[in-house]
Every structure is written in C-alpha cells, then in structure tokens.
C-alpha cells in the first residue's frame, strides 16, 4: 500500500524500541509492516512507508511540521501510556499536535491507553466523545517494609526465602544506583548485577535490558527511567529504596514486577519512621486506587514551542496571527497567545516579513537545523539541594528552598555557600532549633500532592477529623503541623514573610510563626499576590523543580509566574488550606505527636 494507516504515539524512545521488538514478529506475520521513527531513527523512507508507525510526541511534531502529507492517509491514532504525558508540557504539546492534524484530516479513530487513571476527563483533552473503559486489575499487591540498615543482606535473605531469580531495585538518584550495584554484585548474583539510568549510553542501556530479559537470574539497579514499560523479562520482586515521588510513581515501579502473575510483590526500604509512614500511606492509597494527582492545568511554555513548529510547517508562505490563535485556542486563551507572540517578535524569534505574515526568525536557525523546535523536554533535577556541614563535611540532609537560615534535622543552619551546578549548599550549624521543631531526621521528601497532607495527618492523629490539624504555642511562637511537604511548606512560610510575618518552615512538616500567637482556628493563608512575589523570586528554582518545559524562558516574566502559579495549582491549594480547622493541643501533647514519628 505504501501508506501510513496507524500512528502509535508512545512517551519515550525506549518504549518505542521495546514495543517494536515485541510487535514486529506478530505484526509482520499477519502481513502488516511495522516501522518506528524516533530521534535515534529519524529517517522515514517516503517511497516505502509502513502501515503502522511507532513514534514519540517529538517525532510526531517533526513529521507534522516537515512532512505533513505522510499523515494524510491515517485511519487511527493510538496514544500509549497517556498518563505519563498528561498534565505536562509534552501532554499539552500532544493535544495541540492532534488539533493541527485534525485541521487537514478529521476522519480519524482515536484510542488512548493508561496504566493508571485518576482523572475521568483525561481522554476528553485529546479527542472528542472520549469514553473511559476500565479493565479492572485482579493483581494483588503484597509488600514488606524493611529498614535501611544492612538492607542488601535483607534483600538476599528475601531472595533465598522466596526463591527470587530476578530483582528490580529503584533508587531516586543515579549515584545510589551505581553505589549499590557494587554491593549487590556477589553470590548468588555475582556477574548478573546491572545498572540502568538516563546517563548511560543508549547502546549500554539496551545491552542491560537484553541481558536482564534473557538471563535466568539478575539484579537491576535503576532510576525512574525504568518506571516505563520497557520489557526486561519477568521480574519476581521490585525493591523501592526510599519512597518514590508520589503514588503514581510507586504504582509504575511496582507494576514492573510479576507481570505474568496475579500478585505484585514489593519491598520498601525506609531510612526513618517518616519514610515508613510515607510508604504505608502510598501503598494503602495505591491499593484503594486513590492517586491524589494534581489537578490539570495547561502548561504555558508550550505556546512558544508550538508557534515555532507551526511557523516552520508554514515556512514557504508564512502564517497570520489568527491562524496561530486557531491552533492554540483550544488549550490557551487569546490573551496568553497574543502576549507570548509579542515577546517572540520583540526577541527576534518570530519575524514579520510582510504585513501580518509571520515566519520563524533567524534566532531559531540552529534549533531548527537540529530539530530542537519539536521538543518540550527540559532537564529536571527536582529542585532539591544537598546540605553539607562545613564542620564535618558530611551530608546533613536535603532541602527544597534556599533561605539564609533554615531548620534541618532538628538544628538551625546558616548558608555559607551555594554550589548551584552540583545542587549543594555548604552550611554551618548555629545551634539547636526549638524543642518542638525537632522533627524528622529525613532527607527531605516532599514532592507529593498537597491533598495527601490530610491522609498523612490521619495516621498521626487518628482521633481528629480529616481536616483538623494540631496547633500549639511555646514562648510566644506558634507551631502548626501541616505535613504539606517542602514545596508548599516553603511557599506558605515565604509568602507570610512577604506580609511581614516572621514565618519559617521546618522540613515541610511544621509551620512556625515566630513571635506571634495565632488566634482562632483558621489556617494562616497568605495572600495570592504574596505567593506570586515568592514565585517571582524563585523562578529558576521552581522551574527546575516543576519541569516547566524547554521553552519556559521564551515566555515574558509575567507568564513565567503565571505558569508556575498554574503548575502549583495555587487556587486549589488555597482552597484546601481554607478547609483546615486548627485544633489546639498543649505543648506536651504536640511533642508526643511529633515523637510518635521517631519511634
């Protein structure tokens, strides 16, 4: 036929390659040709097109901008693992790409696949008349939690007791995956221990995947890159070294194990009582199907990227601002598009060759040549900083937000130097924090949804109502246990400080109002304008933490602030805080609540 009939869009090149390996034989057997197009395999033979093409959002963007005629023969579009793209810049990019495709081909069938779903409207964002079909899993989740001390030996013991042949271990940092791969490389797994993370060369990653797939035994130490559905064979057990970032991430990770049975078995490794409670909460919510995903908000950084891509598609004749509105308005407002467009003209990234007719500017030539205008992928480091003591040169813990003075591990610290490239802070101890603020000796977990705070609080204070949170007073100071995590904890404290309230956050768990005794039972909610000022001061660090897209800085500053404001779901966050009722307990009782997490 030499005509493309099905476009199968998958989130990553690795997933495309894995799907190709698994599908090429059965699909070819029934007389259908299967192809793939990714950044690694960018060439497409126009004289010999496959009937089914596996690709990524970025390569789909490239085809639409550079070879749109290839897509005119399509009958169907399949969106794989849509939950990994939705509510991200790449998800909004895909939404607009599908709209651009429909402008010249509106007779298409759509299908979206998702391993987890928390938002019933997810399909409607990508195509009309979306119907949700649930295939309820009968897979039972079994898990054990173990302390970090000597956990390598504990994993070996579990392997012996349960007859585990293949084990997948997830770490939240590449350095830990490398370190522990050496510690696991001993009998009975000597020579069969591998590492998998994004920094490895593609050939090495594929070699590791093949060896795990084909070998009879093996341990694979990996990072979040293996949360995706890459086929590494039948894994008997998934080990999670410290809690993942959220419940969806936990489900993705444990879902990699026991794929050919009806039971999932996982081991969670915790370093302190707080992490144990996080694990228990995550697993409990996962079993109940409660994911606590953040509410959908459009990513504004996609506006400039899609303008560049569309202008390239129209490079011969140019396009009008109205045409740009037409492709973007289903997702963004006219004001947002017009404001961003003006900034691109002012910066020379869009040029007006004839009155009202626009083209990509010379500033973009290199990005066009290398295909960079088709990607919204930006490097993300989750915005956390290692805190190193200047006295001992040891790692004290991790914090999200940088302040000159802060509380960590129950002590007060003063920043001496920030090493931004290495995400490190050198700090000196300036004394113990108040007794009531000596909270958790953790490493700074706190990327979960603010809505999870009430669930965590119920585990600590089961006798309180769901939206009741404890408050106490000591020496003219106010202490509120909020458990909102580092991200929202620092936003509250800094925004209140912006309003001349001396406020600080203790490890994303306690709000401290210094020299102020709070009256009433209402949570102290900062004004939204104060929150926006905090966002403005922390544009770069929040961009790093939130993953705001590759073209975030092509937006004007006010839109950068708005993008963070939307990404953080500040409207929903403020609404959540307004539902909290503070319940006073005496200092001794408050300390008892805190100590319950240290047992």
Regions found by a protein language model. Name each.
Residues 108, 215-217, 246-296:
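Conserved segment of the helicase C-terminal RecA-like domain
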Residues 82-83, 95, 106, 248, ...:
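ASCE RecA-like P-loop NTPase motor cores
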Residues 297, 321, 327-329, 334-377, ...:
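Extended, highly charged accessory segments
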Residues 354-456:
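Conserved nucleotide-binding/hydrolysis modules and their immediate coupling elements
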Residues 301-322, 377, 381-391:
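Short amphipathic alpha-helical interface segments
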Residues 57, 154-155, 207, 212-213, ...:
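Phosphate-interacting basic helix/loop segments used at nucleotide- and nucleic-acid interfaces
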Residues 1-210, 216-217, 224, 236-240, ...:
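Conserved P-loop/Walker A NTP-binding site and adjacent catalytic elements of P-loop NTPases
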């Amino acid at each position: 036929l030499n005509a493309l009939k099905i476009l199968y869009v998958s989130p990553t090149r690795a997933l495309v390659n894995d799907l190709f390996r698994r599908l090429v034989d059965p699909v070819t057997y029934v007389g259908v040709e299967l192809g793939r197009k990714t950044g690694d395999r960018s060439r497409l033979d126009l004289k010999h097109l496959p009937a089914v093409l596996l690709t990524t959002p970025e390569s789909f963007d490239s085809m639409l901008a550079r070879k749109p005629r290839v897509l005119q023969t399509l009958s169907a579009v399949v969106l794989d693992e849509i939950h990994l793209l939705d509510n991200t810049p790449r998800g909004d990019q895909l939404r607009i790409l599908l709209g651009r495709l429909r402008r010249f081909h509106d007779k298409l069938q759509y299908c979206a696949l998702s391993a987890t779903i928390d938002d019933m409207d997810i399909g409607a964002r990508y195509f009309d008349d979306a119907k949700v079909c649930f295939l309820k899993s009968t897979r039972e989740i079994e898990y054990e939690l173990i302390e970090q001390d000597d956990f390598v030996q504990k994993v070996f013991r579990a392997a012996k007791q349960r007859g585990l042949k293949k084990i997948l271990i997830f770490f939240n940092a590449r350095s830990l995956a490398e370190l522990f791969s050496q510690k696991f490389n001993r009998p009975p797994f000597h020579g069969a221990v591998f590492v998998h993370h994004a920094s490895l060369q593609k050939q090495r990653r594929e070699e590791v995947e093949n060896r795990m797939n084909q070998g009879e035994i093996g341990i694979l130490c990996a990072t979040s890159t293996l949360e995706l559905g890459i086929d590494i064979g039948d894994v008997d057990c998934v080990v999670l070294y410290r809690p993942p970032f959220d419940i969806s991430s936990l489900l993705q990770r444990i879902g990699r194990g026991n794929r050919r049975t009806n039971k999932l078995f996982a081991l969670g490794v915790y370093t302190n009582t707080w992490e144990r409670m996080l694990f228990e909460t995550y697993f409990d919510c996962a079993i109940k199907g409660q994911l606590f995903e953040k509410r959908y908000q459009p990513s504004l950084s996609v506006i400039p990227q899609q303008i560049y891509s569309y202008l390239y598609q129209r490079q011969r004749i140019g396009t009008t601002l109205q045409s740009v509105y037409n492709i973007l308005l289903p997702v963004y407002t006219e004001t947002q598009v017009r404001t961003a467009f003006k900034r691109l003209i002012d910066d020379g990234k869009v040029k007006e060759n004839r009155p009202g007719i626009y083209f990509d500017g010379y500033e973009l030539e290199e990005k066009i040549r290398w295909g960079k205008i088709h990607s919204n992928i930006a490097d993300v480091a989750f915005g956390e900083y290692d805190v190193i003591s200047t006295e001992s040169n040891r790692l004290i813990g991790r914090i999200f937000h940088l302040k000159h003075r802060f509380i960590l591990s129950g002590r007060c610290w003063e920043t001496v130097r920030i090493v931004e490239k290495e995400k490190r802070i050198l700090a000196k101890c300036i004394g113990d924090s108040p007794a009531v603020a000596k909270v958790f000796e953790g490493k700074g977990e706190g990327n979960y949804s603010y809505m999870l705070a009430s669930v965590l609080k119920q585990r600590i204070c089961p006798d309180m109502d769901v939206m009741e949170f404890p408050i106490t007073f000591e020496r003219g100071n106010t202490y509120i246990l909020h458990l909102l995590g580092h991200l929202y904890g620092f936003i509250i404290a800094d925004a209140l400080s912006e309003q001349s309230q001396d406020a600080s956050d203790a490890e994303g768990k306690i709000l401290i109002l210094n020299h102020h005794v709070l009256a009433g039972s209402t949570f102290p909610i900062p004004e939204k304008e104060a929150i926006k000022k905090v966002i403005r001061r922390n544009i770069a660090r929040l961009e790093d933490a939130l993953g705001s897209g590759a073209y975030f800085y092509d937006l004007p500053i006010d839109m950068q602030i708005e993008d963070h404001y939307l990404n953080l779901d500040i409207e929903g966050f403020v609404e959540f805080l307004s539902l909290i009722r503070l319940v006073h307990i005496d200092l001794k009782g408050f300390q008892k609540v805190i100590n319950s997490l240290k047992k």
